[in-house]
Amino acid sequence: MAGKQKEILVISYLNLRGQTGLQIEKQFQVENFIKENNCDILHLQEAQIDENTFRECNFIESNFSVISNNAENKYGTASLVKNDLIVENVMCDTKGRVIIFDIAGVTFGNLYLPSGTDTVSRSGRENYFGKIIPQILVNRKPMGCIGGDLNCIINKRKFPMKYFNGIKF
């Protein structure tokens, strides 16, 4: 396969469950996830990551760049991007919930929206969907891939469990 260009870009999203911290065992789990899934980009939510976070993970240290958008509450976002991809035009929100960047004419995004069913939380999500994200996406590429932990609440009355093939909410 030498000399051939990779035809598929593997993009994954993973919530690290920040309340449990990011001890070395979990760092190795992230590294194994990247290896097993052959990830080119791994978007993380509930992350508090700095330049030293993965220093014990040789594969990540050698092959990935880290873009982090930490939050005061330690529930931020981060994106691990393979070193052979040229990242441009990085933009983040001020609360650690959004990372947007471009690679080779494509916009990529990592979102971690507020959770909860109370009025403040719902209003926060609506503000991201209706105002913040559209503003961040102005002048971006016409093609893109954006995802993450959107913390959208499913109304069980409108969508009974039979529609989710055993997935529990």
Please give the residue ranges for each predicted region.
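Surface-exposed cleft-lining segments at the edges of enzyme active sites
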Residues: 112-127, 161-163
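N-terminal, active-site-proximal structural segment of metallo-dependent hydrolase catalytic domains
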Residues: 1-57, 75-77
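Hydrophobic anchor at the start of a short beta-strand
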Residues: 11, 87-88, 143-144
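Short, flexible loop segments at the rims of nucleotide/cofactor-binding pockets, characterized by
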Residues: 16-23, 90, 121-126
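Metal-dependent phosphoesterases centered on the DNase I-like endonuclease/exonuclease/phosphatase
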Residues: 32-44, 49, 53-67, 127-169
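Structured beta-strand-rich core segments of catalytic domains in phosphoester-bond hydrolases
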Residues: 41, 47-116
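Active-site-proximal beta-strand elements of phosphoester/diester hydrolases
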Residues: 8-19, 103-119, 147
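Internal catalytic-core helix/loop-beta-alpha segment
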Residues: 93, 97, 101-102, 123-137
